[in-house]
Every structure is written in C-alpha cells, then in structure tokens.
Amino acid sequence: MPASVVLQQPDIPIAAIATPVGVGALAIVRMSGKGVFGIADRAFRKKSGKAFSFEAAEGFTAHVGTLFDGEGMVDEVVALVFRAPSSFTMEDMVEFTCHGGPVVVRRVLAALLDGGCRLAEPGEFTRRAFLNGRIDLLQAEAIGEMIHARTDGAFRTAVTQMQGGLSRRLLEMREGLLQSCALLELELDFSEEDVEFQSREELRGEVIRLQTELSGLVDSYQHGRLLSEGVSTVIAGRPNAGKSTLLNKLLGEERSIVSHMPGTTRDYIEECFVYDKTMFRLTDTAGLRESEEDVEHEGIERSYRKISEADLILYMLDVSGEGFREEAVSAAALCAGHPEARMILLANKTDLVKDSALRIAALETAAGSPVVPMAARSGEGIEELKLLMASMVEGLDKLHEASVLVTSLRHYEALRNASDALHNALGLIEGGEATELIAFELRSALDYVGEITGKVVSEELLNTIFGQFCIGK
C-alpha cells in the first residue's frame, strides 16, 4: 500500500450491486471486508437444510440457498465464497447471485447493509484491490477502460494493460532509475573521497537508454488515444449545408435537428459510432459564418475550437449554388492551420445539379483533399464516406498487437515529464555539472514514473480515478 494513503474505514465491510441496475435475468450483489462471513451466515440458509457456515466454507466454492431479511424470505440465491488473500480485493468476499428484478436486488443489498455493511463508494472494490497490493494503479485504470471499451482494439489494449504489459515496462525503467540514483547517492555520501561509483560515460549511456524507452511510450499516446477515445471527427461547413442531416445518417437515427433555416445548430452535438472496428467521435458544429447574434456567435467560436482539436474534419459544401470553389479554398486554409488533422470534402446536394462531375473536379483542384459526392438527405454517398474515413485510419484496430500503447492522458503527461527530467539530466552530465543536480533530475523522473504505477500517489488522485468507476466495481 502506498505510504501516502490509507484504506478508509478498513474494519467496516462494504457492499454494492455489481451488475447494471434494471430488469434482468440475474444480478450480483457483493460484499468485501472483515466480518462478511458472519453477515452472510445471518442472512443465508442452505437449500438442503443442512447446517452451514461461511466462516468454515472453503474459498472458491458455490452454495445454493435462500436469503432472508427482517421481513422474511427475499430470494433463492447462489453464494460464492472468496477467502483472503485469494480474492479480488485480497479480503474475505461473498457474492450473491439473485434474480435481476430491481425490488429483489434492492432487498438483497438492504439485507447486507442491515447486517453490518456500508454502501461502497464508486470503485471502492477496485480501490481496495489496489491499496491491498492485488493490482497496481495502471491495472486498476485498465479495468475501467476495459469496461468502457467500444471497440475490439480498445478492449484488447485494456486487457494487455490489465495483465501488466505497461506495468512491466515501467518497472524495468524504475529499476534502472533506482540503480543510477543509488550510485549517485553513494557519491554524495562519500563526496570527500572524490570517487565515482559509476563513470559519467556509463551514466550517460543509461540515461540515453531510459529516455529512448520513455520517448517511445510518449509517442505511442497518439495512436493509443485514438484507440481508447476514438477518432475525433468534426462535421464543419456553412449553415444549411446539410451537416445535421449527415450526422443523423451516420448514426442511423434522428439525433440532430434538421431545418431549412440557417443557424439552427447553435452549439456542437457529440455522438459516437463504430465502423470497421474503429470508433469515431462525431461532432456536429454550428455553421461557420459571420453572426451578430451573441448565442450563435458563441456557438461558432466553439466550432472553431473543436476543429482545432480534431483528428478528422468532414467539411460539407453545398455545391448546388455558387461560391463553392472559394469555400473549398477557405476550407483547405482552415485545415492547413491544423496540420495534424486530415480533411475530407463532402460535395453535398449533387442531386440538385446537372454538372456535378465538373463541380467535383473543381473542388478537388481547389482544395487538394479527397472529395465525396453525396446527397445527404437521401443517403447517397454515405457508404463511400464511411469507407474513406476507415481507410484514413487503416490499421488502427491492429496497433495493440504490435506493442504496449499509452492510452491515458494522465500517463502521457507523467511520461513526458519523466522524459523531460532525463533530458535535463543528460544535459547536466554532458556539461560536467554537480552530482547533486544530476541526482535531483533522476529522482524527479523516478517520481513521475511512480505516479503512473501508484508508487507515488495522493488521496486526491485516487478519488479522481476511482470516482469514475461504478459503485459495485
């Protein structure tokens, strides 16, 4: 357990519903901590009628019986027994599988709370697993990512992290940093004797090796982010170009208001859809134009901010009127201001003109980006657009197979800080600076790596991480 945090109320067992709330065939209510076997004994009767005690039961065993509360029988249940330290939380645990009706589940939970448990905080079971040493902080976060994964690639990346893939890499780096720090500390302790326990050339080589490893992980975040969060895809264009219609067609539902009146979308709307194993986070933005109205103007400003953050820009033009060539040039200039983003021009309303082929050729020349002709209202061109979107991120779903990926902004920032500290240390070594200064930078890098795995952690950070979990996890 990290020295800076302690387990809250360790003597009070916790209980919570572990399955989604609602109507279902089955549900699970679990409890963990000291005294859970006694609580279970008071609420449970074995179906066979034979005397039974959870205190005496072996771990990893299942028992069929009836659960009671103060009003009588609640439900027939299956009780699973997990004995410390061989449970998820490394504490004694009991899980009751009951029927999935909301009244049944609520009464099962109430019986355990009346018996002496308190209601678990969000993520508290996983938090206890971390604090008791069952998993590190990376693995705890991976559990949350696995639960919320929307694609196979994101799921498999989370599984790799949960199994310790990234943890092992960081542990190896941490051992290297610890070794170098220890040798520098020895030098400081014996400074009067003017000895080097590790030559500066050897230290330089070790720092370069560690920084190269860290830089590789930092660089992997760009792809890891796309796998975990999805490809940020902004639908942009002037008012009444058909942006909201496109969003609805891509989603297959009426999510955005469609109107012939320009300026209907005053703020951006975000939704996700998965195509060819890749998740796209779609943002339907307010139409880009000059506006004197405060509300619409703010929506347009937000549109520009979303465009600046996008991985992919779907710029929609109405080719049924005049000025579309000039707008294509403006769209290209807009995208050029964000070179990390890619753009697809959508030539909408081609069904309303006879010379659509000529107009599309003019767009390709003007913008230098791929052009998809479409009639969004009828759905023409939607499948071609999806194929092009998928081709632009081709191979993303297989990235998890090649290496360990960083998917969390928190991990990315800590790794970048650690890499910066090693960069500073390398400059000090090459400049022949004092041992104290070099040691300070190496210790900083060590602390940043420790922040990721949980070796260096605060109560506030744990509350932020585990507060994003559901109560029963």
Swiss-Prot record:
Query: Tell me, which GO biological process terms does this entry list?
Result: tRNA methylation; tRNA wobble uridine modification
Q: Which residues form the TrmE-type G domain?
A: 230-394
Q: Which coenzymes or cofactors are required?
A: K(+)
In short, the EC number is 3.6.-.-
* Record-listed GTP binding positions: 240-245, 259-265, 284-287
Cofactor remark from the record: Binds 1 potassium ion per subunit.
Identify the keywords attached in UniProt to this record, alphabetized.
Cytoplasm, GTP-binding, Hydrolase, Magnesium, Metal-binding, Nucleotide-binding, Potassium, tRNA processing
* Enzyme class, UniProt record, top EC level: hydrolase
Which GO cellular component term is one of those annotated? cytosol
Task: Report the superkingdom from the record.
Answer: Bacteria
Q: Where does Mg(2+) bind?
A: 244, 265
Q: Where does it live in the cell?
A: Cytoplasm
Where is it chiefly localized?
cytoplasm
Q: List ligand-binding residues for (6S)-5-formyl-5,6,7,8-tetrahydrofolate.
A: 30, 95, 134, 473
Pfam families associated with the record: MMR_HSR1, MnmE_helical, TrmE_N
Gene Ontology MF terms in the entry: GTP binding; GTPase activity; metal ion binding
PANTHER family from the entry?
TRNA MODIFICATION GTPASE GTPBP3, TRNA MODIFICATION GTPASE GTPBP3, MITOCHONDRIAL
Q: Describe, as the record does, how this protein assembles with itself and its partners.
A: Homodimer. Heterotetramer of two MnmE and two MnmG subunits.
Which family would the database say this protein is a member of? Belongs to the TRAFAC class TrmE-Era-EngA-EngB-Septin-like GTPase superfamily. TrmE GTPase family.
| Job of this protein | Exhibits a very high intrinsic GTPase hydrolysis rate. Involved in the addition of a carboxymethylaminomethyl (cmnm) group at the wobble position (U34) of certain tRNAs, forming tRNA-cmnm(5)s(2)U34.
The name under which this protein is listed is: tRNA modification GTPase MnmE
Origin species, per record, is Chlorobium luteolum (strain DSM 273 / BCRC 81028 / 2530)
